[in-house]
Design a protein with these regions (language model features):
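C-terminal beta-strand edge segments of enzyme domains
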Residues: 2-3, 11, 221-285
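Beta-strand-turn-beta hairpins that frame and shape the catalytic cleft
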Residues: 6-16, 153-162, 185
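Cys-nucleophile CN-hydrolase/nitrilase-fold catalytic domain and related Cys-dependent amidase chemistry
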Residues: 27, 35-116, 122, 192-211
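Residue-level recognition of beta-strand->loop/alpha-helix junctions
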Residues: 20-22, 52, 124, 220
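Active-site catalytic loop in hydrolytic enzyme cores
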Residues: 101-181, 194-203, 269-273
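CN hydrolase (nitrilase-like) catalytic-core segments centered on the catalytic cysteine
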Residues: 73-94, 160, 166-255
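Short beta->alpha transition motifs characteristic of CBS
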Residues: 57, 111, 122-129, 236, ...
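N-terminal glycine-/serine-/threonine-rich phosphate-binding loop
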Residues: 1-48, 66
């Protein structure tokens, strides 16, 4: 990533970065890998930095994530990232960590951390990816993770931000609701597979940005993981008109862009669809 210009930015401008990772089976090395990339992004001028879904651990073996997870107050990754945000004086969105919430399941939980190291917002992934493709190919995210039930918009000094995670991308009403609640920038950290990513990743993110008139910040997992999973990469930063402002490739690294938040109001003025919802009936509704 080329260094962001060092001149002071207008009040409406915000320098954001996505960290693209290939998280593995052990929490410690994943913390180290994420921290190194976060430091690099901060050194290059980013004020708000986001990491992907499951930053601290990817292990698809049944029960493995739960066995390696902890409660929020004991989570080593969360503690490390809170300290790092304070040290670097940045806003930090940790795409998600597995946080134990009962005796069998975790929450797939995002954390927005402020520059003093305090947790400004939490969001538990609402939509669980449960699918049976054939008799031998079944994936049930809900077996290991408890679904969230609350949409979240957080207020920061420069922008109102909405929080989502991965599979949430396929539910456009969530993004419209976040925008209606004031979100100007929406995070979509993810771990899309290579197959679904190639087919849908760019289309979904651009559509959600256009529909909501919001910036979309989508840090991704990438490549062949130690557990055998293959994720798509291609972290994206997208403007409210649907334009791609920055895109990663298929290797770990960072991308960045300088956002002008005035563009949110401009896009919504040109296409004011957020104010044009109507009730309707028919089609069996």
């Amino acid at each position: 990533m080329s260094q962001l210009p060092g001149a002071p930015t207008p009040e409406s401008h915000l320098c954001v970065a996505c960290v693209q990772m290939r998280s593995g089976l052990e929490v410690g090395p994943n913390i180290d890998a994420a921290s190194a990339l976060i430091r690099r992004a901060a050194d290059e001028g980013a004020e708000l930095i986001a990491t992907p879904e499951m930053t601290s651990l990817i292990d698809r073996k049944p029960g493995a994530v739960f066995a390696k997870s902890t409660t929020e107050d004991a989570d080593p990754a969360l503690a490390a990232f809170r300290q790092l945000a304070s040290e670097l004086n940045i806003w930090l969105l940790i795409g998600s960590l597995p946080i134990r919430v009962d005796q069998e399941r975790c929450a797939n939980r995002s954390f927005l951390i402020g520059p003093e190291g305090a947790i400004a917002a939490r969001y538990d992934k609402i939509h669980m990816f449960d699918v049976q493709l054939n008799a031998g190919n079944i994936y049930r995210e809900s077996a290991g993770f408890a679904a969230g039930s609350e949409a979240v918009v957080a207020r920061t000094p420069k922008a109102n931000v909405g929080l989502t995670v991965c599979y949430d991308l396929r539910f456009p009403h969530l993004y419209r609701d976040l925008a209606k609640a004031g979100a100007e920038l929406i995070f979509a950290p993810a771990a899309f597979t290579r197959i679904t990513g190639e087919a849908h990743w760019h289309v979904l993110l651009r559509a959600r940005a256009i529909e909501s008139g919001s910036f979309l910040i989508a840090p991704a997992q990438c490549g062949k993981h130690a557990d055998g999973r293959e994720t798509y990469g291609h972290s994206l930063i997208i403007g409210p008109w649907g334009e791609v402002l920055a895109e990663a490739g298929v290797e770990p690294g960072i991308i960045a862009a300088r956002l002008d938040l005035k563009e949110v109001g401009e896009a919504r003025a040109k296409i004011p669809s957020l104010t044009h919802d109507r009730t309707y009936r028919g089609a069996g509704l």
